[in-house]
Amino acid sequence: MAARLHLRLGPRLRGFASSFAPLLAAHPRALPLSRMGSVAPLAAARARRGFGSAVATAPPAEDEDFATAADLQFEPPLKVVKYPDPILRARNKRINTFDDNLRSLTDEMFDVMYKTDGIGLSAPQVGVNVQLMVFNPAGVKGEGEEIVLVNPVVYKMSKRLLVYEEGCLSFPGIYANVVRPDNVKIDAQDVTGAKIKVKLSGLSARVFQHEFDHLQGILFFDRMSLDVLESVREGLKDLEKKYEESTGLVSPESIENYKGRKDLISFSR
């Protein structure tokens, strides 16, 4: 689905997205995810079997810093941050203030997502380094489920792995295969601060995992195999060059010097 994901998935997922959309009912974005009428039961039914052991995504430490009011400030209209801007690698703080400003931020994120033909967006992608994501697998305003997840923690992933072509609004024009688990189980909070448990599968699980990676400072090429990474090398170099030309700064990352990420949970077959 080359057109619908801040994670923009490649052409092979277009049909999957269109077939999934009718299963999603219209839903107000402030409604807690635990009460979603269609996505949660559907995902739970698909995720009943095949979960592996707990993954290394630990709860926050007691002394972990939370986002301040300044961390959550933003000026509309929001713009998508492009690779290799260091904002995409920066630490994203947890949120403990659930107010009108947070609701406004999620509203703005949805607006950007729809305007850029996305189906998911993380806060760091619009320059706000906090643990927040929004997504709607339908990809159309007024259709499907508008989902907001705050401070998400993954506690289980399925052993079943799937390969799909992904893209990302922060990497315009770049698409490549990424391996990810088909199902995930999540602890999070909704936009009101209520604690929720979520089970996701299929497209929703993939969108979530792509966005969740952003919240950890992980970019989708970090999960590509060496041969797949080689296929997008020139595209990444072009983005690095554009960054230097537009900012007058040396690119903070260089694909030519990239050694991979050793801190990732491996999804390789």
Curated annotation (Swiss-Prot):
Domain of life: Eukaryota
Catalytic class of the enzyme: hydrolase
Disruption phenotype: Chlorina and retarded growth.
Active site: 211
Keyword check for Plastid: yes
GO CC terms in record: chloroplast stroma; mitochondrion
Tissue: Mainly expressed in mature leaves and sheaths.
Annotated residues for binding of Fe cation: 168, 210, 214
EC number(s) recorded for this UniProt protein: 3.5.1.88
Primary location: plastid
Activity control mechanisms: Inhibited by actinonin.
NCBIfam families per UniProt: pept_deformyl (TIGR00079), PRK00150.1-3 (NF001159)
Protein family per UniProt: Belongs to the polypeptide deformylase family.
Record protein name field: Peptide deformylase 1B, chloroplastic
Phylogenetic classification of the source organism: Eukaryota, Viridiplantae, Streptophyta, Embryophyta, Tracheophyta
